């Protein structure tokens, strides 16, 4: 599912990877699919593991990500061997590090009185327009009465695409 498919490709240098999970129903929350279903859960698991690995290696978690993140032009074995033709993870991480003043705030500091100050990091990406995976088409037809018919292969799942696509037409 999306849990592994959208998270493991973040680290394009991985020579071996495996992802397994169990879906568990509880009486706490709804188990239905929502927008982004699966991807965020997988990203939380992978990024938590990367942070744990950085701690065990006594390495800055940003540095660990910078050394292993997928970059533009790199083949992503975990993403059907696709090439990352448009990818700015490296620039995003650099900008985020600068904006949150990472070098000043990492590692965490014990402030006394049971208080600790620190920062955390995680990254995510969303592939769009991936050949043979994310494909779509749109057609527009002028009817005899002068009105248009917009033919799309999408359903509005609360994202507002019905409204937006009709406005674009």
What spans do the regions from the language model cover?
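Gly/Pro-rich active-site capping loops and adjacent beta-alpha segments
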Residues: 1-42, 113-169
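Generic amphipathic alpha-helical segments used as scaffolds and interaction surfaces in large
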Residues: 37-40, 51, 55-56, 79-87, ...
């Amino acid at each position: 599912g999306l849990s592994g498919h959208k998270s493991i490709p973040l680290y394009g240098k991985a020579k071996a990877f495996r992802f397994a999970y169990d879906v568990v129903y509880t009486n706490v929350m709804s188990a239905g699919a929502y927008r982004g279903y699966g991807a965020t859960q997988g990203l939380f698991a992978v990024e938590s593991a990367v942070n744990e690995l950085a701690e065990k290696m006594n390495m800055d978690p940003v540095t660990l990500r910078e050394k292993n993140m997928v970059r533009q032009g790199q083949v992503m074995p975990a993403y059907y061997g696709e090439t990352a033709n448009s990818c700015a993870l490296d620039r995003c991480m650099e900008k985020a590090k600068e904006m949150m003043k990472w070098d000043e705030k990492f590692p965490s500091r014990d402030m006394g009185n049971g208080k600790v100050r620190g920062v955390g990091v995680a990254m995510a990406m969303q592939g769009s327009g991936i050949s043979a995976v994310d494909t779509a088409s749109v057609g527009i037809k002028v009817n005899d009465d002068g009105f248009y018919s917009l033919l799309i292969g999408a359903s509005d799942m609360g994202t507002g695409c019905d409204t937006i696509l009709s406005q674009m037409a």
